[in-house]
Amino acid sequence: MSFLSRQQPPPPRRAGAACTLRQKLIFSPCSDCEEEEEEEEEEGSGHSTGEDSAFQEPDSPLPPARSPTEPGPERRRSPGPAPGSPGELEEDLLLPGACPGADEAGGGAEGDSWEEEGFGSSSPVKSPAAPYFLGSSFSPVRCGGPGDASPRGCGARRAGEGRRSPRPDHPGTPPHKTFRKLRLFDTPHTPKSLLSKARGIDSSSVKLRGSSLFMDTEKSGKREFDVRQTPQVNINPFTPDSLLLHSSGQCRRRKRTYWNDSCGEDMEASDYELEDETRPAKRITITESNMKSRYTTEFHELEKIGSGEFGSVFKCVKRLDGCIYAIKRSKKPLAGSVDEQNALREVYAHAVLGQHSHVVRYFSAWAEDDHMLIQNEYCNGGSLADAISENYRIMSYFKEAELKDLLLQVGRGLRYIHSMSLVHMDIKPSNIFISRTSIPNAASEEGDEDDWASNKVMFKIGDLGHVTRISSPQVEEGDSRFLANEVLQENYTHLPKADIFALALTVVCAAGAEPLPRNGDQWHEIRQGRLPRIPQVLSQEFTELLKVMIHPDPERRPSAMALVKHSVLLSASRKSAEQLRIELNAEKFKNSLLQKELKKAQMAKAAAEERALFTDRMATRSTTQSNRTSRLIGKKMNRSVSLTIY
């Protein structure tokens, strides 16, 4: 007798009852089974893999099930038809502590297993013992008679009856779907049986691994809907993260284990679930970004300040902060067009470049009715092309000092763009904007109201629709008037030097040259290193610098870093306003020190004169006193004596 038998004697059994449970999985070509199999296939063939859960009774007084490798009661299988043919598959497990004579009542000392509706294989995890069911009137399988509802009775009766499809016992028994909703299944995971593997092979539809075994159609449909509704994210091609993503290829597939608080399950997420969560979503197009009109809700349009090939630019004031912005709106719908990529490229470049004093600042972008809108910094001076047109109308030109300042500031903007491994590829007067600001001088802070402020002109680079990477260029050719010859020949080895070439021609246009040709002999002469005719006299050093910038060999052209450090641009004749202000403050400080020293010297001189005068006075006074107190010794003195008698 085992230890369990000595401590706890087996409970009394009914007449003819056995201590073991025998359950059969009956597969018959009846209509009920076919209907149930069709329902299970509709739920998804991946739900019956058995990888995610296994049967286990909570708070069961029985010991846990032994693994197949551990020593234990031997397993016996009753003869039956082959798994491939319609018939019944019977698997018996010998319960520990089985009493003798069980073979007579139940057909042998065989173990128990749960019949799983719609699974095709029984779970090897241990089910409750026979005494647990002997006192109950419910069973997970239907019995033949209303009086005998125990698992033993069902097993004995089924041995002699024909094949029947498994069905719930009676209304009190929880149905299979409700049982699944209880989520009473835990590790260890149930391995696939031969029959379930065969069914998985025959399945026509393949689901993602890791799908929950007990996910019904409503939940799975809801989950797929949620996945489809997940906000998508664009990948910025100009960020370092995008390079790492493309270089690494697909994300590594790994498994993770997490705890499900709702049912106490230690579940293992599969590879494809993680891929669905971490895989970068496809690019958001203009059509998918439609929303309520943000332009009319958040901004008040003041006027139209410009237009071009891409669209129109409007001067707007934001209702929330009251600041003025430039809103760029595409003329025609961009969804699915070639201009859509240019619009997205401009947004990507603005987001990566961030804020720089010589690059137009970017704030936000969105889509409305298939149109792209970009919120940028408002430059009150307009574009350089507008200024050149105005100068041409009044026959006035930028002076050499102003041209040097223009070249220096735009060169600093290009240096910043090139330092981010990007190239602009469309430098021209219409893409350079002017911002005029009033900056208080230090003299105003000291109380000098004659020169209280100075106008500072800032040149900023805008329109980043042609920006591309230096390492992996996707060149979209810009204006042919400012296009370098090597770019036209599809030689992209020196793309930053193409921006230098275009900048030189931009300065030439600002100097008063005639409009540049789009093609022809004059176009080729410029690509050979000949400057267009300039209607004003420039210094030889500045002219030579412009010639070097349009040299036919791109390697001979200076880089943006070398350009901003050139001696011609940093000569003493042209100093910035900040440098002049610093020198002025230094001279004022020196002047104040000299004034203080002068006052000290004057005070010292006055004190010395006062001390000298005081010394003279003291000397004169001492001489006078000495003369009055002196006596003549050895001489006769006449004294008068008066006597008054009363």
Curated annotation (Swiss-Prot):
Mg(2+) 2 binds at residues 342, 465. It catalyses: L-tyrosyl-[protein] + ATP = O-phospho-L-tyrosyl-[protein] + ADP + H(+). The keyword Kinase applies. Mg(2+) 1 binds at residues 431, 463. GO terms for molecular function: ATP binding; magnesium ion binding; non-membrane spanning protein tyrosine kinase activity; protein tyrosine kinase activity. The modification Phosphoserine is found at residues 53, 78, 85, 123, 127, 137, 139, 150, 165, 270, 307, 312, 642. CDD domains: PTKc_Wee1a. Residues 158-170 have a biased composition (Basic and acidic residues). Synthesis is increased during S and G2 phases, presumably by an increase in transcription; activity is decreased by phosphorylation during M phase. Protein levels fall in M phase as a result of decreased synthesis combined with degradation. Activity seems to be negatively regulated by phosphorylation upon entry into mitosis, although N-terminal phosphorylation might also regulate the protein stability via protection from proteolysis or might regulate the subcellular location. Residues 32-43 have a biased composition (Acidic residues). Residues 1-181 are annotated as: Disordered. Belongs to the protein kinase superfamily. Ser/Thr protein kinase family. WEE1 subfamily. This is Wee1-like protein kinase. It comes from Homo sapiens.
